[in-house]
Structure formats: structure tokens, C-alpha cells
């Protein structure tokens, strides 16, 4: 079976998906490989246990770790069972990985001729920019509206084409039986005038048909309405998301309306009946009215929650989802074959590519492939994005992990000859391994960097212009180093993981709010039912009111906290999962966000639980949402230091900041804060990072490098600090 991959489009502007068989991918890789790349590299000595688990053979790069292998540099056994669940979402239970030590050990095992920067066989071709290769059109349905966000919607009319369930067969058979009985009661003279409990047989047949087959008929009706809306382009743009969300509620509401109308019309209330029978009929009628009222409230509740969830997700997650989807597209494109270069012979016009992702169906292990047009994703605006498009993008992030096209890399690197699905990255260790594979797939042989020409073999010029600034130092040097590429892949994985947790927690919070509102609606419906039945008289209502007042003293504080938590989560929303915040002066990472509580993770991985009602009263600093943050480095020099040396020191500091534009902003200031004890100048350097304090480890590393650089400057300029002269009294003993 061939795996479905996203292509970079055709010249006609159509969106296509290509199927690359495993045999063909292997054959292409062998044709593109050079003789040098096919030669084996002898081992210098037998590999160590750690490297042998990582490296398959002399010509094969290390595999990405999985559940069956150990970590890259694992030298100790885990203290806890491997079957226990991780206690944190953001803390991997693996040992730390030192990439420099790893490379040295692998080089020792593979020989001096091995280089981690050596490219894959895909790279042994001339550097040139071609256009997409001819592809085989697949069943990709793409919108043609340039103003509306374009997405791949594979499930258009899926319900119309789905298999008939067993329940539907039973309902259909029952409908046919009741319909036959109705026809018989209207045509056969014996049954035409026969009555049962004072009601004709045909009326009983109609009533039974409405009650037991009404859902079947309304289901057909709703499918027809949804089909008309889906095929009507102007309507589908904005209301499709709400149509699918409200379909079941509207269906139940229409069914209850039919039952109530049939009950009122079929039973002739002018007919004289016994008082008991009349009372029963009134009770049933009023019960149906109360149930219909509850169904209407349920419909309104569903609509309001859908609007709340849609607006909340667009306002808080759209930008992050847009970036995450683009990053996944970049990773998948760079991990595959250089389609632009292969298409050079055909000469088709280049266009933006497509991102394919698989969603896991809850009922079973089937995965549904979907495709998103990246060109239209770039053009989306938060103010114009529709709820349905937002749902598709959220599904792409929440139900599928960060993945690479692993079969191409595995075929060329390992030569196992078996097809594999897109490999999802599930840990930082696997992100490191994936970064190695992708870098080796893109870079030229024996090159330790990637240039713009290398990326143009996989993407069009417009996409390369968007990708290049993502890597540290690439915009200044015009090259992407392996270290910068690896750091970017790890950063993409961590941000994708945090975003997926945020979407899942938001969905959980909406479900909890839905349960709360449902409970309130059930109570309201019961009260309306009691009022219609005239059971809840004034005395009864007065009694319940006094009980509610007494209950308010008991659960009043709980209700207040619940309301404040809802406002905090859905209105204030000062942070998302994965954000680093400061609460009560302590920097913590948001681990989990629920409707009532938030779980934080300290720098030492200690979990802290805060009620949201308490957090609503506290000032919260959010590093992730902050702009590039400033840094202050204080140091002291001797009061006797000449002004010329201080000026020279400022020039050296400015030169250092200009030489590291990927770490520091050029705008800075060196000031004298104060003079202490007439022998010391307390100075401070104020400069801005190119990052926020969200990346705490990176911030500390940059600050350390800056402090050491200032130390070297002080030593070179012979600037030091001396104590004040001290009076020493000596006494001589006889």
C-alpha cells in the first residue's frame, strides 16, 4: 500500500496528493545516490553497548528512540518502573542527552571518515530550483474561494455515505410495519371504524409512528438540510460548524414538537371523558410541554457553548495553531524527497505545498488522512477565520502529533524495505534524532550547514523566505548550522506539545461547563414541570425558597468560587498550558489548566496546585506573552579607573552585542548606578534579549556568556577593584 503525501501543487493551481510506493521511493533513492555514498565505512573498533543500540550499521545513522530501545546516552537504570505513567507532561523520564559526547562516541565507532553532516543520497544532485513533479490526483477536495480559508474536508457528506447501523435497520423495519398498519386501518372496513380506548385505530398508528419513528424521519430531514447547506457555498462558509454541532439538538426538538402536535390534534378534548381520564390527558400534555421547553433550553445552551468555544479558541489559539501547522509542514517537507528538484525535467509552475495529517478515530484504530493547503493558511486572518476552519486546524494539532515522513528516510538510511507511517515525535530525545535525519536529508554531503539553495530543492522561494528566519543566526550568515536546526526542531516539538495540551484542557473545561449548565437546566425543567402540573403551589414554592436560602449559607462560597473560576478561565485567561508565569514572586510553568484549578510546575519540577478563584485575585506575570525581555548585568570597578578605560569598556561591550545579534539587541546602555565608599563604582549593563524568559535555560546560558565576556574585557583592560586603605595599628611587646 502506498502512503499518501502532500505535494507542492501543480501548475494549474490545483491541489493534489501523490502516492509514493515504497519500491519506487527506494529505487529513486538508489538512482540519486552517488558512488561515494554507497561505499561502506569500516568500524574502528566494536561499538559500545550504548552506541550499538543507537547505530544499526556503519552506513546507517542512529535511529530515533522508541519504546523498545533505551535512551541515547543512558548509563543508569531508572529508579522507577518503566510501566509507570509519567508524573508530568513536560518532564521526560529519560536521562539527559549530551549531543557533543554522543557525536564523539559515534565517530569513534564509525571511524574518522564518518561525518554527522554528511547528507543523504537524496542530495547527490545539482543544486537547482525546479517545479513540482507530475503527480497523480487523489480524492482531495479543496475550496475555490480565495476569501475563505481553505482546508481539506474529507468528510463532506460522510454521513450520507456511511454504512447503515443495526439500530437504523430496526427503526426502518418498525416504520414499515407501522406504516402498513396505518394503511390497513384506513382501507379495511373492519378496522376503519374500530375504536380502542375511545380512539380510532389509525390515530393510534399515527401516534405510535410519531413516537417511535419520529427520530428516523427527523434524521432524514436533518441530513437533507445539512446536505443542502454543505452544497450551498455561501452558507457553508460560516454556519457549517454550528450546523453539525446543533444537528442532534435540533433533531430532538423537532421530534418533540411532532409528538406534542400529534398528541393535541389526535385526541379530541371536546369528547366527554371521566374526570380521571381527563386529568391524565392534561398531565401528559403538560409533561410534553415541559419536556419541549427543556429541549429548547438545551438547544440554546448548545448554541451558546458552541459560540463561546469558537470565539475563545480563535482569540487565544489561532496564531499559535497557524505557526504550529506551518512548522509541521516544514518538517514533513524537508524529511521527504526533493520534489522540486525531481520536477525540474517537467517544468511545471511551483506553488505552495500541502500538509497531510492523520487523525485517530475513537471507535477503532483507523486513521483518517486530511490535507491542508499551506498557501491559504498563510493568508488566514484571525478576524475572518470561520469556526469550521478553526475546528479543522485544532483537530490537526490536538489529535495528531508532530511527525516526519519517515519512510523515505528509513528506506535510504536503513534499507529495510518496509513501509512505515509518518513517525510522530513523542519526546525531546526523538526530536534530536529527527533533527539529525532531516538535516542529513537536506544538507549537501560533508557539509555542516544548510544553505538557501538546499531548501529550494524542497520548497518554493516564498516558503524559503519564511523558513530561513526561524533559525538562529541564519538571517545574518545565510547558513543554517546543525546546532541551530536541532534547537529549532526541539523548540517546535515543545511548543507543539504545549499547544496540544492547551487545546485538550480547553476542551475539558468546556465539557465541565457543559455538565454544570446541563444540571441547572434539568432543575429548571423540573420546576417548570411542577408548575404546569400545579403541584408546586405557592406554599410549596415558599418552602423551597426558605430551603434555598439556608442552602445558600452552606454552598454560597462554593458557587461564588465556581463563578469566579469560569470568568477566570474563559474571560480573563491570563495564561495557557506551557506558559511560564510568575505567581507570588515564584516563576512556574503551567502544567495543567482545569475549570476550578491550575497545576503549576516549579523550576525543580515540584507541582503546585492553585484554585482559579484564588488566582483571579493575584497579579500574574506571563513570560510567554511578553515581548523580548531585558537583562541587567551588574558589576563593580575601582573608583580610580580612568574615564578612558570606561569608555573603551563601553565600546568593547557594544562590539560584543553587535557580534551576537541572534542573542542580544544592539540597543543597550552602560550606566554608573552609584559610588560606594569612595572606592567603588557600581555599574550596570542594560540590554534586551531576542527571547523572553519563557526559555529559562537559554536565558541563563546567554547571561552567563555575557558575564564571562565582561570579565574577559575587564581583564584585558586591566580594570580591577581594590579595597580602601586600612589603618593597621601594631604594638610592640617587650
UniProtKB/Swiss-Prot annotation:
This is Mechanosensitive ion channel protein 10. GO terms for cellular component: plasma membrane. Its main location: membrane. It comes from Arabidopsis thaliana. The gene is MSL10. PANTHER family: MECHANOSENSITIVE ION CHANNEL PROTEIN 10, MECHANOSENSITIVE ION CHANNEL PROTEIN 5. Residues 1-75, 115-136 are annotated as: Disordered. Mechanosensitive channel that opens in response to stretch forces in the membrane lipid bilayer. Detected in the root tip and throughout the vasculature of the root and leaf. It is found in: Cell membrane. It holds the Pfam family MS_channel_2nd. GO terms for biological process: detection of mechanical stimulus; leaf senescence; monoatomic anion transport; programmed cell death in response to reactive oxygen species. It is a multi-pass membrane protein.
Amino acid at each position: 500500500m502506498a502512503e499518501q503525501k502532500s505535494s507542492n501543487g501543480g501548475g494549474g493551481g490545483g491541489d493534489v496528493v501523490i502516492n509514493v510506493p515504497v519500491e519506487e521511493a527506494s529505487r529513486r533513492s538508489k538512482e540519486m545516490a552517488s558512488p561515494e555514498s554507497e561505499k561502506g565505512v569500516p568500524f574502528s573498533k566494536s561499538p559500545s553497548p550504548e552506541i550499538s543500540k543507537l547505530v544499526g550499521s556503519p552506513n546507517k545513522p542512529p535511529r530515533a528512540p522508541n519504546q523498545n530501545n533505551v535512551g541515547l546516552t543512558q548509563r543508569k537504570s531508572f529508579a522507577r518502573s518503566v510501566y509507570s505513567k509519567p508524573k508530568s507532561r513536560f518532564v521526560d523520564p529519560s536521562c539527559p542527552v549530551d549531543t557533543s559526547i554522543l557525536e564523539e562516541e559515534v565517530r569513534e565507532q564509525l571511524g574518522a571518515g564518518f561525518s554527522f553532516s554528511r547528507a543523504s543520497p537524496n542530495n547527490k544532485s545539482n543544486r537547482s530550483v525546479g517545479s513540482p513533479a507530475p503527480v497523480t490526483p487523489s480524492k482531495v477536495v479543496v475550496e475555490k474561494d480565495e476569501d475563505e480559508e481553505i482546508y481539506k474536508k474529507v468528510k463532506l457528506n460522510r454521513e450520507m455515505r456511511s454504512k447503515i447501523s443495526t439500530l437504523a435497520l430496526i427503526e426502518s423495519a418498525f416504520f414499515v410495519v407501522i406504516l402498513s398498519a396505518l394503511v390497513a386501518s384506513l382501507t379495511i372496513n373492519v378496522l376503519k371504524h374500530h375504536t380502542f380506548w375511545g380512539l380510532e385505530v389509525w390515530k393510534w398508528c399515527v401516534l405510535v409512528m410519531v413516537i417511535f419513528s419520529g427520530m428516523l424521519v427527523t434524521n432524514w430531514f436533518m441530513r437533507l438540510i445539512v446536505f443542502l447547506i454543505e452544497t450551498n457555498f455561501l452558507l457553508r462558509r460560516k454556519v457549517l460548524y454550528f450546523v453539525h454541532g446543533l444537528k442532534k439538538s435540533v433533531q430532538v426538538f423537532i421530534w418533540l414538537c411532532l409528538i406534542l402536535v400529534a398528541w393535541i390534534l389526535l385526541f379530541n378534548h371536546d369528547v366527554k371523558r371521566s374526570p380521571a381520564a381527563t386529568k391524565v390527558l392534561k398531565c401528559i400534555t403538560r409533561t410534553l410541554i415541559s419536556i419541549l421547553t427543556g429541549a429548547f433550553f438545551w438547544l440554546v445552551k448548545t448554541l451558546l457553548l458552541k459560540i463561546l468555544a469558537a470565539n475563545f479558541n480563535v482569540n487565544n489559539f489561532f496564531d499559535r495553531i497557524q505557526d504550529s501547522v506551518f512548522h509541521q509542514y516544514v518538517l514533513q517537507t524537508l524529511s521527504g524527497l526533493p520534489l522540486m528538484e525531481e520536477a525540474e525535467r517537467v517544468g511545471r509552475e511551483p506553488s505552495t505545498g500541502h500538509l497531510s495529517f492523520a487523525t485517530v478515530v475513537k471507535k477503532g484504530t483507523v486513521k483518517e488522512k486530511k490535507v491542508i493547503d499551506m498557501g491559504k493558511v498563510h493568508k488566514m486572518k484571525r478576524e475572518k477565520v470561520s469556526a469550521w476552519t478553526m475546528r479543522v486546524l485544532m483537530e490537526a494539532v490536538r489529535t495528531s502529533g508532530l511527525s516526519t515522513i519517515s519512510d523515505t528516510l528509513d528506506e535510504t538510511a536503513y534499507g529495510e524495505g518496509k513501509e512505515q507511517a509518518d513517525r510522530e515525535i513523542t519526546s525531546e530525545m526523538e526530536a534530536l534524532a529527527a533533527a539529525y535525519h532531516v538535516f542529513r536529508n537536506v544538507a549537501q554531503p560533508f557539509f555542516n550547514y544548510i544553505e538557501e539553495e538546499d531548501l529550494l530543492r524542497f520548497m518554493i522561494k516564498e516558503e524559503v523566505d519564511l523558513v530561513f528566519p526561524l533559525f538562529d543566526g541564519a538571517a545574518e550568515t545565510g547558513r543554517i548550522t546543525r546546532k541551530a536546526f536541532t534547537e529549532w526542531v526541539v523548540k517546535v516539538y515543545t511548543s507543539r506539545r504545549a499547544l496540544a495540551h492547551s487545546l485538550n484542557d480547553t476542551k475539558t473545561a468546556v465539557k465541565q461547563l457543559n455538565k454544570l449548565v446541563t444540571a441547572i437546566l434539568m432543575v429548571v425543567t423540573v420546576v417548570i414541570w411542577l408548575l404546569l402540573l400545579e403541584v408546586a403551589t405557592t406554599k410549596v414554592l415558599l418552602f423551597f425558597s426558605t430551603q434555598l436560602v439556608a442552602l445558600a449559607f452552606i454552598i454560597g462560597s462554593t458557587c461564588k468560587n465556581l463563578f469566579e473560576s469560569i470568568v477566570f478561565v474563559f474571560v480573563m485567561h491570563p495564561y495557557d498550558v506551557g506558559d511560564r508565569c510568575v505567581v507570588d514572586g515564584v516563576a512556574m510553568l503551567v502544567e495543567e489548566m482545569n475549570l476550578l484549578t491550575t497545576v503549576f510546575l516549579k523550576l525543580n519540577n515540584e507541582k503546585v496546585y492553585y484554585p482559579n478563584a484564588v488566582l483571579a485575585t493575584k497579579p500574574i506575570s506571563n513570560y510567554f506573552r511578553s515581548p523580548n525581555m531585558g537583562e541587567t548585568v551588574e558589576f563593580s570597578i575601582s573608583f580610580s579607573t580612568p574615564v578612558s578605560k570606561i569608555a573603551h569598556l563601553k565600546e568593547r561591550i557594544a562590539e560584543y552585542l553587535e557580534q551576537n545579534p541572534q542573542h542580544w539587541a544592539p540597543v543597550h546602555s552602560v550606566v554608573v548606578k552609584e559610588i560606594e565608599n569612595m572606592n567603588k563604582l557600581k555599574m550596570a549593563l542594560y540590554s534586551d534579549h531576542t527571547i523572553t524568559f519563557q526559555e529559562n535555560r537559554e536565558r541563563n546560558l546567554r547571561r552567563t556568556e555575557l558575564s564571562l565576556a565582561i570579565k574577559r574585557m575587564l581583564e584585558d583592560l586591566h580594570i580591577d577593584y581594590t579595597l580602601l586603605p586600612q589603618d593597621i595599628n601594631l604594638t610592640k611587646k617587650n
